[in-house]
Amino acid sequence: MEIFLYIILFLIGIFFGSFYTLAVYRIPKRQDITHTHSYCPNCNHKLGLLDLIPIFSYIFLKGKCRYCNEKIRPRYLILETLSGLLFVVLGYVMKLDLLNLSTIKIVEFSFMVLYFTFIILISGIDKENRKMDKMVSVYGIVISIMYMLYLCIVENANIYRYGIYLALYIIVLILDTITLKRFAKNSYLTGILLMIITMLVFTGRYVTINSIIITLLAMAIYLLIYKIIERKDKNRRTDKQISKTISIGFYLGFSNLLSLIFVLYCSNFVLWIGG
């Protein structure tokens, strides 16, 4: 029965992954992500049903567009596969069981899916464009408020802690508004701060702090490798110039998902040892 559940979760996950690839491409271009038909970005030909089956279409078409024969970027296959596996792992660490599936479990799993959607979209867009998309940030704030209301009303969580998170949201949004008025552009830093607050709401302090530490280490390693490779280049960039090209949101999101899965798995392991 568990295998059947994991197959279902994997299939749901790869369809979400297909949506993620579409959204990461379209959102920065401000294109519709729900009603506009999928099309090839090279020849603009509308894709048929057989072109839209996650993973399988990529394999059967040998990684090429059926209409213009242009190569399809492997990120589509990678993200769809990883998304499917992520859903399976989430179901496993949350101990989902078809025979004993409670309403609370369904709600908690749904909130995690909404959160994963936020993390993947904000991270993917940042990796492709080095930009913290404001629409995705707003989506993160909305699902955070929904989750906080759920925790406070249903699970009687500490309302003061979430009140602090709301206050932090307001402060950062005010700073972002000031930055927008003064410099006529959204601040990358405020986008990162909004992302961190959303991480705090869904994953707690421990996972968030761990994610930040891993991100800083990854950035330090990246800078070190760059220095070693480019040390003989007379026109090499400074650390400050390089840091402006690093997609911090991507590293932060990736490390957060890994940290969250690891903590949930360890929690289950401790309960199993003690039980």
Role assignments for model-derived ranges:
Residues M1-G275:
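A membrane-topology feature that recognizes alpha-helical transmembrane segments
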